[in-house]
């Protein structure tokens, strides 16, 4: 079964039937409107974010499968913080504040793409990204929180999400 993979970045829940997607789908004999509708349904939970998508097409049967990737850590943090873009000067200009719980949820969402093995390490990685884009966490510099996480100050909160972390497949 010869398959063709189409890898594209789409705006979550807002895929349009235009180039470069439409001509590619047409060449493969697929119904463009139907594929676009399914793409919008599959990416609706990432509305307004850039989402990596792979469409696997069986060239013989014209059957296809849509695989939705996970947006970048930056995109997820910005969405949670209600900001549209990173700070141009993250050291001095803050663009939003998140709770540590929000950061933990993003870490869990990103687990399949991370090389870290523990939730604690993943959260520290998310905090590093938050610092670089000008997002504070718990109204503090994320660097401070990294230290507090290492010291065990948030072990109870992390333990609350440990099962959820362990259930996510890598």
Swiss-Prot record:
Keyword Ribosomal protein among record annotations: yes
Transmembrane stretches, start-end: none
SUPFAM superfamilies per record: Ribosomal L11/L12e N-terminal domain, Ribosomal protein L11, C-terminal domain
Example of a GO MF term: structural constituent of ribosome
Entry GO CC: large ribosomal subunit
Pfam family, one: Ribosomal_L11
Key words of the record: Ribonucleoprotein, Ribosomal protein, RNA-binding, rRNA-binding
GO BP term, example: translation
PROSITE patterns: RIBOSOMAL_L11
Keyword Electron transport carried by entry: no
The family this protein is said to belong to: Belongs to the universal ribosomal protein uL11 family.
NCBIfam families: PRK01143.1
Oligomeric and partner information: Part of the ribosomal stalk of the 50S ribosomal subunit. Interacts with L10 and the large rRNA to form the base of the stalk. L10 forms an elongated spine to which L12 dimers bind in a sequential fashion forming a multimeric L10(L12)X complex.
HAMAP family from the UniProt entry: Ribosomal_uL11
Function: Forms part of the ribosomal stalk which helps the ribosome interact with GTP-bound translation factors.
Entry protein name: Large ribosomal subunit protein uL11
């Amino acid at each position: 079964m010869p398959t063709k993979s189409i890898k594209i970045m789409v705006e979550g829940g807002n895929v349009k039937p235009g180039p470069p997607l439409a001509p590619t789908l047409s060449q493969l004999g697929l119904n463009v409107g139907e594929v676009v509708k399914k793409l919008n349904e599959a990416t609706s939970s990432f509305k307004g974010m850039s989402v990596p998508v792979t469409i696997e097409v069986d060239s013989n049967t014209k059957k296809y499968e849509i695989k939705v990737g996970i947006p970048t850590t930056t995109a997820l943090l910005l969405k949670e913080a209600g900001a549209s873009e990173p700070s141009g000067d993250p050291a001095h200009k803050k663009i939003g504040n998140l709770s540590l719980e929000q950061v933990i949820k993003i870490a869990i969402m990103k687990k399949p793409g991370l090389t870290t093995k523990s939730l604690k390490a993943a959260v520290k990685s998310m905090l590093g990204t938050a610092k670089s884009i000008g997002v504070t966490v718990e109204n503090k510099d994320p660097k401070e929180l990294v230290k507090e996480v290492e010291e065990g100050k948030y072990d109870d909160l992390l333990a609350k999400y440990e099962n959820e972390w362990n259930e996510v497949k890598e």
